[in-house]
Amino acid sequence: MSEKLKVGILGGTGMVGQRFISLLENHPWFEVTTIAASPRSAGKTYEEAVGDRWKMDTPMPEAVKKIVVMNVNEVEKVAAEVDFVFSAVDMTKEEIKKIEEEYAKTETPVVSNNSAHRWTPDVPMVVPEINPEHMEVIRYQRERLGTKRGFVAVKPNCSIQSYAPVLTAWKEFEPYEVVTTTYQAISGAGKTFKDWPEMVGNIIPYIGGEEEKSEKEPLRIWGHIDDEKKEIVPAASPVITCQCIRVPVLNGHTAAVFVKFKKKPTKEQLIEALRNYSGVPQELNLPSAPKQFIQYLEEDNRPQISLDVNFENGMGISVGRLREDTVYDWKFVGLSHNTVRGAAGGAVLCAELLKAQGYITKK
């Protein structure tokens, strides 16, 4: 492998930024050379800027401790140092939209963990195992931005990872109505129990904006590129209704899901479809790709966070409790790691796919 690509992390001091830095330690293709954050962190070493707010289980990588944090708003300066950036900035949606496009216009590809551009019509929102072909919309985005290399690509919300891959694996049976409730970990809010003591022994039945994302984002992932409109057009079905609940768990989003199918399958057909489902990342053997994307667990008391959340290093999806339902056809429970597959890990896999497809190259 030739020289590694130089990576910048925008918003490197927050929880998702820290997860990017942890995941990219010893990455075979990418090397974190630049970290940018808010003006108050700029000028300090990364170690100083984070201080006692390091939230990962593993220690801070030695290689990043002495990196001097740059001001994320000094776009030209940061862009000059890197081949591409991961974005985990904490700003308003409008500010994020603007700054990510500014980076793209410096001919620096942006792979974002933020929601700001998820509905920008020519921005691909990708789960690499599900819709890698959506990256082809980048050529239309580059036309609009007037760039040759620069673009923005995003990954979808963490909440949908526990059921959207499962429904994709069952596409041939035509699911048309889906009811789900997600039970979401506190790290999804960038918090630990130390930061958020009121979550201990508590449940909060509301997460702002999350239900709409959980209902609509899968349809965009299942959509197609309209070459006349130069954009991604979402799919019309299945209809999804969702409730999102914050639960006292550190990592891992669980979903209880009920599904109606146009062609009602057998249990064996459903399980076989899950176990056999894989995608382009597995074919290409991308560094962060799980060998097994979805596992089905036979035991009645699985999937469990404590046993299953780190399946395939947090990049795999665990499914269990598949059984016939009295109102719907089938029901199941899904589990995914919200800050690995659901956030930074999913974005790293997107970047690996973009490199393999030739969209991200050395400057």
Residue ranges of predicted features:
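N-terminal Rossmann-like NAD(P) cofactor-binding subdomain of oxidoreductases
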Residues: S2-P205, V239, F311, I317-S318, ...
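Charged docking surfaces used in two-component/phosphorelay signaling
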Residues: S187-K363
